[in-house]
From Swiss-Prot:
Protein name, as recorded: Large ribosomal subunit protein bL20c
Record bears the keyword RNA-binding: yes
Principal subcellular localisation of the protein: plastid
Disulfide bond annotation, renumbered to this chain: none
One Pfam family named in its UniProt record: Ribosomal_L20
Any Gene Ontology CC annotation: ribonucleoprotein complex
Length: 117
């Protein structure tokens, strides 16, 4: 009886997985089981870090706004600024406020003085 060659399905699946891991180093780009483990781990990390990125940027914006507001030598804090913004119904989010704080501090000082009075 002649020998039957294996099909292409498993090879195609492994090739697809190897293409995903082609930029990895060492066994993580060569051994199929290790590639599969690393692929799962990398997808988990990317999913987790997409949420983490939003948290990190929000913290950065808050820190920048707070630093500029407190650097004005006025007894005024970030929480009071945000509270007054909401009270006055000004639609400035933290990202925009942080950009204003870095690029044009005088504008932020004007905004804070306007909403305080």
């Amino acid at each position: 009886m002649t020998r039957i060659r294996r099909g292409y399905i498993a090879r195609r699946r492994r090739t697809k997985i190897r293409l995903f891991a082609s930029s990895f180093r060492g066994a993580r780009s060569r051994l199929t089981r290790t590639i599969i483990q690393q692929k799962i781990r990398s997808l988990v990390s990317s999913h987790r870090d997409r949420d983490r990125k939003k948290i990190d940027f929000r913290r950065l914006w808050i820190t920048r706004i707070n630093a500029v507001i407190r650097g004005n030598r006025v007894s005024y804090s970030y929480s009071r600024l945000i509270h007054n913004l909401y009270k006055r119904q000004l639609l400035l989010n933290r990202k925009i406020l942080a950009q204003i704080a870095i690029l044009n501090r005088n504008c932020l000082y004007m905004i804070s003085n306007e909403i305080r009075s």
